[in-house]
Structures are given as structure tokens and as C-alpha cells.
């Protein structure tokens, strides 16, 4: 068992998303607040908190869908406002049972849910 003042031993290393618009998708993720760290003709890698990497993979054709991951922010309302001011069109904020949330669509049409934080307040 991990003590409250210790970091968990594991975290998510990589998540992946296909895109038919690599450059536009990379720019979109940067606008969401991710850090670009590596790019080739076929992939772009962006860094999130805890050193999780989003790997964008160029594909000729994709079927837009809901992302297999979601994002979390400390202040959902402020973040929603920042995205709106940046020209991104998030959905309205919805009240959920555990989180409040909204969605955005990346340039390839994938839906990405952004949740309010549920941090336990313990060391992570």
C-alpha cells in the first residue's frame, strides 16, 4: 500500500490518436495546453502533466470518433473560457455525477472530453 505522502509508482505513459491532419491536430493540442516534444512526417508527440505523452499518428483516412481518453483540468470554467477566447468552440459545461465536463473536437473530428479535477489531494 502506498502512503498518502508517497507518489504512486505508475502513471500513464502514452496515449495514441490517429489523425488525417497531423499539423492541424498538433497545433490544436498545443492550444489545449500540451507541449510539443517530438515530430516526424508521420507522428507528433505532445506532453501532458506527469510526463504522459499523446502520440498523434498520421493516417490517410480516419473515422472520427470519441477519444479513448479524456483530459482533466484544475479549473474547468476558466479553462473553458480560455479555449473560447482562443477561438476553440467547446460544448457547454455539463454537470455530471462525479465531474463537470465539456467536449471539444480536434481538426480530424475526434471528440475529446475535458473534466473537472477529481484529485484526492494526496501526493501524485
Which residues make up each language-model segment?
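N-terminal beta-strand motif that seeds the catalytic metal site of vicinal oxygen chelate
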Residues: 1-23, 67-69, 118-124
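Core segments of cupin and vicinal oxygen chelate
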Residues: 9-10, 16-53
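Vicinal oxygen chelate
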Residues: 11-20, 60-86, 100-105
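Structural preference for long, well-ordered alpha-helical segments within the folded cores
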Residues: 27-31, 82, 108
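Conserved catalytic-core motifs of GNAT/GCN5-like acyltransferases
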Residues: 35-41, 94-95, 119-124
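Active-site beta-strand termini and strand-to-loop segments that position acidic
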Residues: 46-51, 104-107, 117
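A short linear hydrophobic-aromatic micro-motif
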Residues: 54-56, 89-92
